[in-house]
């Protein structure tokens, strides 16, 4: 028997394996264009999540940047500054 999915999954779609097989191309297009993951439920196996490669790479990069506690602290501090309108705009070096 498959696992029970949480009642509320914000910003996620869910489809059965059968529907996913029938509408694979459309689901892949939606996942890539909307950047909203889709859960594919299976009767006797654990569910899987389909996300775009772009979103996966973004998650991996975020995890990498937050791995270092010092780097994570600096990033969180910078985010707070931006949220409080204390950010400084700078030109990028090429």
UniProtKB/Swiss-Prot annotation:
Single Gene Ontology BP annotation: regulation of DNA-templated transcription
Similarity remark: Belongs to the phD/YefM antitoxin family.
Organism this protein belongs to: Synechocystis sp. (strain ATCC 27184 / PCC 6803 / Kazusa)
An example Gene Ontology molecular-function term: sequence-specific DNA binding
Entries under InterPro entries matching the protein: Antitoxin_Phd/YefM (IPR006442), phD/YefM_antitoxin (IPR051405), YefM-like_sf (IPR036165)
Record-linked Pfam families: PhdYeFM_antitox
Signal sequence region: none
Name of the protein described by the UniProt record: Uncharacterized protein ssr0761
Annotated Gene3D superfamilies: 1.10.1220.170, YefM-like domain (3.40.1620.10)
